[in-house]
Each structure stands twice: as structure tokens, then as C-alpha cells.
Amino acid sequence: MESLKRWNEERGLWCEKGVQVLLTTVGAFAAFGLMTIAISTDYWLYTRALICNTTNLTAGGDDGTPHRGGGGASEKKDPGGLTHSGLWRICCLEGLKRGVCVKINHFPEDTDYDHDSAEYLLRVVRASSIFPILSAILLLLGGVCVAASRVYKSKRNIILGAGILFVAAGLSNIIGVIVYISANAGEPGPKRDEEKKNHYSYGWSFYFGGLSFILAEVIGVLAVNIYIERSREAHCQSRSDLLKAGGGAGGSGGSGPSAILRLPSYRFRYRRRSRSSSRSSEPSPSRDASPGGPGGPGFASTDISMYTLSRDPSKGSVAAGLAGAGGGGGGAVGAFGGAAGGAGGGGGGGGGAGAERDRGGASGFLTLHNAFPKEAGGGVTVTVTGPPAPPAPAPPAPSAPAPGTLAKEAAASNTNTLNRKTTPV
């Protein structure tokens, strides 16, 4: 049931995307067709001109048309015949030249124009009609890009380029329309502004150009929207594929999280999770094994080498004295790691061995040795040993040691040998 619902949702989403692409394609070619019709037809403007009149009540018409004599004070000026014009030609609807079309002359010979003036530049742009033509070309290219995007669906940049072309075509179209209106409003003539407004109107070619502008902007927005949706879908699909690949690799014994780590958004989260999980999996530090005794601070579990510390040789006499003192009691320990002496005369031998170590270890106080095994679960083992003590004459054996003296001496010698295992951090 869930799979059917998901299939219906995907189908509805695909239909919606297909409708958007279809509307964009149809709108692109419709806008191109409207702009082409507007450029090629001569119904942008309806006005009256003297070139189409049959009679001219004034004497000496500038356009060379016939005039009716009289020359009295009751002479009236003929407004001229009705004409329709486009970007290139003007055609007569009335008068003697009815149905005749002539090319528009934007620069009459009897008019002197300053080449640096704004009016001259406006007439040049109006005569060339470069902006409407550029708009039509951009619309055609945009329509081709939309059609190509339906074939090459994996290349999302094509539909983005089409949207940019449509927006640029709309801007070029509206600039051309503004230039055309400005050129007509600035047309020189003897009429006042009120009379000019009553003697010209815009035709259906002009409105076709305006409709082409609206369509170009709408389909430009649609094309950009399609590009955004496709990019979002591709991004989500890539994320889901990586997550599936990571889950499959993790289930089969591979490195599952490695695929997820390729995603920038999951990189930091995974590091934080791995750190927290490693901290939670570490054993709690043992209080008994802590260097500071119960309640002392713990240290992280790591691979640290064993360090052997050698003591100052000047302190070897203390160990020798302790060893000699324990000779009579039997069992006094040697200096800094010497084995415990045997009962009776074994203490003297232990003292001699300690003296030999004191003589050989006079090189310094601390000596670093990199000889220790690395264990995954172990901590740091620190062994403190003393150098061999110089030979000393054996002291006379005491007759009767006081109660508790031997135990105190043994405890003092035991403190010179440290073999501690630090707790993991």
C-alpha cells in the first residue's frame, strides 16, 4: 500500500514537471511567433499623414501633392489621410494612394539633425529596430534550449540557459517598445500635444509585441523554477544513494560510514558521534590503580613506552647501609630493585651487589629507555631503579636488633622500588 502511494506521488510529481516543461516549450515558441508577427507586419501605429490626402487646401504642399487653388482667408489645412505603419513601412488606407506602402524615412532631407543629440540617437535606434529583432532571436534560442532539455535530461544547465535567454529576450522587447513610443511622442510637427494624441493610436502588431514580452518573462521564470526543482531532486537523490551505499557496506562488513563521510553536512556530525561513542566505551578509571591513590585522577588509554629512571649515585650509600644492616637479620632487600637477600649472610651479598650497581650507574639521574611492549588495554608502566652502589666494607652485625627495626628498614627499602601501572585516561 505504501509503495502504491509512493508511486502515485512520484507519478503526480512527474506529471507536474512534464506540464511545466510543456508549458515552457509552448510558451517559448508562442512568444517567438508573436514577436515575429509583430516585426513583420505594418500595424503598429494608426495615424494620419499628408502623403495619402486627395486634396490640399493649402498652397504649396511640402509633399508635392496636388492642391486646390483659392488662396483666400478661408483656407483650411487638411489633416491628411489615415495610414497604418510598422517598423519598416507606412501604408495608406484613404486617399489617392490607398493601399500603397512606402518605406519610412526616419531622416528627412529638409531636417537638420545634430548627430550628438538624443533625438538623433533615438531615431537611429528606431530605424534599425535592433531590440525587437534581438528579442526574437533570443526567444528562438531559448525555445531550442527547452526542446533540447527534454532530450538531455541529465544536463540541467540547458534549462537554466533557456531561462536566462527568455528573461533577456523580454528585456530587449520592452526596450524596443519604449524606444518606439518615445520616437512617436517626439515626432516634430505643427500640432499641439492634445491634437497629436487624438490623431494616432496603436495597432494589434504593437500589442502582439507587448504580449510577447509578457510570455517571455513568464516562461523565463518557469524555466528557472524547473532548473531549481531538478537540482534539488538530484541533490536529494545523491544523498539517498550515498546513505544506501553506506548502509549496505556497513551490513556486509565493509566500511559503511566512509560513504556517509563524503557528504560535507555529515562529516562534522559523524566525528562528534564517533568521539562520544569512543568516550562512552572506555572503562572507568580504577581508584586502586590510580597514582594518587583512591579518588585520584585517571589518564586516557594510550600506547606510552616504559621509562626507566636511574637515581643519583650519591644516594647509593644509603641503599648499601640498609642492605648491610639487614645482613644479620637475613632478608633485607638490595638497593632499588636488588633481589631480597637470603636469611643470615645473604644480606651482605645483596649489599655488595647494590654497591656494584651504584658504581656503574653514575651517568645521570634520569635515563630514558624505549624498551617496552604496547598493549591495547594496558596503561603506562613506570619502573624506577637505582644505579649500583660503590663497594663498602661490611659493617659489624648487630647483636640484637630492636623490635620492629627490621620491619621499618624493609619498608624504607621497598619505597625505593616503584612499579606502578597508571590507569587509562
Curated annotation (Swiss-Prot):
Residues 272-304, 343-365, 377-425 are annotated as: Disordered. Pfam families: PMP22_Claudin. It comes from the Eukaryota. It is a multi-pass membrane protein. GO terms for molecular function: calcium channel regulator activity; channel regulator activity; ionotropic glutamate receptor binding; protein phosphatase 2B binding; voltage-gated calcium channel activity. Keywords: Calcium, Calcium channel, Calcium transport, Cell membrane, Ion channel, Ion transport, Lipoprotein, Membrane, Palmitate, Phosphoprotein, Postsynaptic cell membrane, Synapse, Transmembrane, Transmembrane helix, Transport, Voltage-gated channel. Palmitoylated. Probably palmitoylated by ZDHHC3 and ZDHHC7. GO terms for cellular component: AMPA glutamate receptor complex; dendrite membrane; endocytic vesicle membrane; glutamatergic synapse; L-type voltage-gated calcium channel complex; plasma membrane; postsynaptic density; postsynaptic density membrane. The chain crosses the membrane at residues 19-39, 129-149, 158-178, 208-228, 318-338. It is found in: Cell membrane; Postsynaptic density membrane. Gene3D superfamilies: 1.20.140.150. Detected in heart left ventricle. Residues 387-401 have a biased composition (Pro residues). Residues 412-425 have a biased composition (Polar residues). Residues 277-287 have a biased composition (Low complexity). One of its GO terms (biological process) is positive regulation of synaptic transmission, glutamatergic. The modification Phosphoserine is found at S252, S255. Residues 343-354 have a biased composition (Gly residues). Belongs to the PMP-22/EMP/MP20 family. CACNG subfamily. Regulates the activity of L-type calcium channels that contain CACNA1C as pore-forming subunit. Regulates the trafficking and gating properties of AMPA-selective glutamate receptors (AMPARs). Promotes their targeting to the cell membrane and synapses and modulates their gating properties by slowing their rates of activation, deactivation and desensitization and by mediating their resensitization. Does not show subunit-specific AMPA receptor regulation and regulates all AMPAR subunits. Interacts with CACNA1C. Identified in a complex with the L-type calcium channel subunits CACNA1C, CACNA2D1 and either CACNB1 or CACNB2. Acts as an auxiliary subunit for AMPA-selective glutamate receptors (AMPARs). Found in a complex with GRIA1, GRIA2, GRIA3, GRIA4, CNIH2, CNIH3, CACNG2, CACNG3, CACNG4, CACNG5 and CACNG7. Interacts with CNIH2. Found in a complex with GRIA1, GRIA2, GRIA3, GRIA4, DLG4 and CNIH2. This is Voltage-dependent calcium channel gamma-8 subunit. It comes from Homo sapiens (Human).
